[in-house]
């Protein structure tokens, strides 16, 4: 049974109506480590729907949190904004409404591309609309009870002047430098003093926010959250989930949500991703490289409590291969496909996203043979036996491959088709050159040749009595030439790319027009560097 179904079954034993929540502070580039939270929430939500639950999925943008520091990606001029809510800090590029939206907009767009469509709630709007007002009044009135819970659970001493509410200074706009000086529950206002020297009064609705350890359980109560994934840092002993459980029960009279604790995504050899440290690959950036369903698969296949190692270089090819094998087994209704694998595939797919038929590795070959020309890509795709009806999805996959080649591809995955016979062809043996000439003669006599057929033809050269073996024999004047297919593949790559290795030969050869191969192999079979110079 898949982990998402286990969760859904567990929570459905308590109630048939559920609100699955996920929330992230858009303080920097929202990376694929954050993506784990949202995809995990989406999987639980979909599992609930599949079991007939009345369920909703929400994403809460914690855009009323303060800017904590001048992050490495920010200019020093942002020092004056440290302590202000990020919804009130200027946009780094100047094109968005504020700092939070600068990072939030591409993230929400990335979610759409992943087939995830939550209701998006912004914390600043919820506070200003008064959704938290009753929770704020309760927290202020029960300040001592909350402080006692925090001390008992976290083991840390709460300062005498601590308050569960952080007022926003009317003068400097900061919420990290103020102290509560008093409050009026009837008027729903809070008096404050600020380190900037200003003092004043703010409304509870939008005039500040609850501290994190109170804000989180208040949110559960206000919205009725029943399921929520969160990182292992929040789940540590004495952490914010432990304090939140008691606060929501004892202060707000609600039950805490079912917790889905997830581990980090480790980025290659660079460790856990963090927006604040710069160890990050944003979801938007990664969607330029990896098909959406493969990114979903990366999360869906692994239990939340296990860490994920992600490397967008060569290991990405292995991940894509793994997913494509699963996809093919599902499409072919392979009897070896178990229920668990089937469920992984179902949850990795989503409506509204492309599901390309063309293998990623094959597109790597096609794209480079086409030299990046999309019209040529379409011709090769069609020649390779794939439908070109869904041009949008083909372009998306081609764009993925283009960015991968540019940013992450290892050297062995890259190649360029030489316009003329490469000088390296001079290093080929007489037998290799004879093979190229014989291969050109053979494929000229045949009609359309598939990638698999090209592959088998090359291998047939080693078989005594095969058509290709006889043609080679005639050219080298040997009754039965002893042929090693490895040397023949080397001859193919050398004559076209000027290197001894290349992509999967069948895909590679079927990407070219047959006329090009015939001409190139014949020229290579008689290549003389002195005559060519």
UniProtKB/Swiss-Prot annotation:
EC number: 6.1.1.6
Subcellular location per the Swiss-Prot or TrEMBL entry: Cytoplasm
Listed InterPro entries: aa-tRNA-synth_I_codon-bd_sub2, aa-tRNA-synth_I_CS, aa_tRNA-synth_I_cd-bd_sf, Lys-tRNA-ligase, Lys-tRNA-ligase_SC_fold, Rossmann-like_a/b/a_fold
Motif ('HIGH' region): 26-34
Sequence motif: 'KMSKS' region, positions: 272-276
Domain of life: Archaea
HAMAP family assigned to the protein according to its UniProt record, in alphabetical order: Lys_tRNA_synth_class1
Protein name per Swiss-Prot or TrEMBL: Lysine--tRNA ligase 1
Organism of this sequence: Methanosarcina acetivorans (strain ATCC 35395 / DSM 2834 / JCM 12185 / C2A)
This protein's encoding gene: lysS1
